[in-house]
């Protein structure tokens, strides 16, 4: 049976295509918008059965052009949290997602989709409950609104619906994202270009570089998606993060030490990196005040209750692996 991945040339989508290939799955329809043409590079080492532009996909899927579809991994979205065009965001992230969902329900296909931790906004609790959901931007709202649709539809659905609230994802195949790429990606490039990594200074009660996030490797994101793909009886909305909040300082220190190790130099403590000017703190930008999550940490209770019991990579493990991969691409 056919599998469909939307956003297939994007960051998480391409990693899912690759992970499916590694399991022997090649009957995959890749759906994306290649207006940004350089994204094609993410699929060069992947095997797919067909490619469709997102503008023609939904109509063809809805009328059954692809025969029996087992599952749709819906990763396609505008993920730019600084996007201010609300009409574009809602059309792209909300209405388009509803159309894909409707087609899946009509055909009995598994629907596994990308939600986001941006739904929680400035909340200090990160559980999959309506009362703690308060997005700070229109991106978060587009994801929030779709999750509300899912909550209404899920009780009557005859096929799987699984949504994943991705926390701060990093890893291979994200270079096309530009400013929206992960902190690890930007730290890597900045250190190579300038010989130092810059982090935000003090803000909202957090010391320099001590704003904390739940940083999750795209390797783990793919594994969780595939777990639910293998268990179509399990539906729900699930946080997808490590369950650990780690400061940006941990990312920077790991990037610096991994690059030093690749050059045969010894590891340094964060304090030593700061003292030597390898990590530098800059004033927090006014444009982000009031719109910035200083703390995120996935509550994994629902995910673990659904049977996913594999450990998640720490920042030190995952970022080290990622930096070595980036270095190997040079």
From Swiss-Prot:
Reactions it catalyzes: ADP-D-glycero-beta-D-manno-heptose = ADP-L-glycero-beta-D-manno-heptose
Enzyme class: isomerase
Keyword tRNA processing carried by entry: no
Cofactor(s) of this protein: NADP(+)
UniProt GO molecular function: ADP-glyceromanno-heptose 6-epimerase activity; NADP binding
Pfam families the UniProt entry points to: Epimerase
Note on cofactor: Binds 1 NADP(+) per subunit.
One BP annotation, GO: ADP-L-glycero-beta-D-manno-heptose biosynthetic process
Active site, renumbered: 139, 177
Binding site for NADP(+): 11-12, 32-33, 39, 54, 75-79, 92, 143, 169, 177
Pathway: Nucleotide-sugar biosynthesis; ADP-L-glycero-beta-D-manno-heptose biosynthesis; ADP-L-glycero-beta-D-manno-heptose from D-glycero-beta-D-manno-heptose 7-phosphate: step 4/4
Record carries keyword Hydrolase: no
CDD domains: ADP_GME_SDR_e (cd05248)
Keywords: Carbohydrate metabolism, Isomerase, NADP
HAMAP family recorded: Heptose_epimerase (MF_01601)
Domain comment in the entry: Contains a large N-terminal NADP-binding domain, and a smaller C-terminal substrate-binding domain.
Role: Catalyzes the interconversion between ADP-D-glycero-beta-D-manno-heptose and ADP-L-glycero-beta-D-manno-heptose via an epimerization at carbon 6 of the heptose.
Family label: Belongs to the NAD(P)-dependent epimerase/dehydratase family. HldD subfamily.
Subunit structure, as described in the record: Homopentamer.
Protein name in the entry: ADP-L-glycero-D-manno-heptose-6-epimerase
Organism: Burkholderia thailandensis (strain ATCC 700388 / DSM 13276 / CCUG 48851 / CIP 106301 / E264)
Lineage: Bacteria, Pseudomonadati, Pseudomonadota, Betaproteobacteria, Burkholderiales
């Amino acid at each position: 049976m056919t599998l469909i991945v939307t956003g297939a040339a994007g960051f998480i989508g391409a990693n899912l295509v690759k992970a499916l290939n590694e399991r022997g799955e090649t009957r995959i329809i890749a759906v994306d918008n290649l207006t940004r043409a350089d994204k094609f590079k993410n699929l060069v080492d992947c095997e797919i059965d067909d490619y469709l532009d997102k503008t023609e996909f939904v109509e063809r899927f809805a009328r059954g052009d692809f025969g029996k579809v087992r599952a749709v991994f819906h990763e396609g979205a505008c993920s730019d949290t600084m996007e201010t065009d609300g009409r574009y965001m809602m059309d792209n992230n909300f209405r388009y997602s509803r159309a894909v969902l409707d087609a899946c329900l009509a055909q009995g296909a598994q629907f596994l989709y990308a939600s986001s931790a941006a739904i929680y906004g400035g909340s200090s609790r990160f559980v999959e409950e309506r009362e703690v959901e308060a997005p700070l931007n229109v991106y978060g709202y587009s994801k929030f609104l779709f999750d509300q649709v899912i909550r209404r539809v899920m009780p009557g659905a005859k096929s799987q619906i699984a949504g994943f609230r991705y926390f701060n994802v990093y890893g291979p195949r994200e270079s096309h994202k530009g400013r929206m790429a992960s902190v690890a990606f930007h730290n890597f490039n900045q250190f190579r270009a300038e010989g130092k990594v810059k982090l935000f200074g003090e803000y909202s009660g957090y010391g320099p570089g001590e704003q904390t996030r739940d940083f999750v490797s795209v390797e783990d994101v793919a594994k969780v998606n595939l777990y639910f793909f293998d268990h179509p009886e399990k539906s729900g909305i699930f946080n997808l993060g490590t369950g650990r909040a780690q400061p940006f300082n941990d990312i920077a220190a790991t990037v610096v030490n991994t690059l030093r190790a690749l050059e045969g130099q010894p590891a340094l403590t964060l304090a030593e990196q700061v003292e030597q000017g390898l990590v530098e703190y800059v004033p927090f930008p006014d444009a982000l005040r009031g719109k910035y999550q200083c703390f995120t940490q996935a509550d994994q209770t629902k995910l673990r209750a659904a049977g996913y019991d594999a450990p998640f990579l720490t920042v030190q493990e995952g970022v080290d692996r990622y930096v070595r991969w980036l270095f190997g691409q040079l």
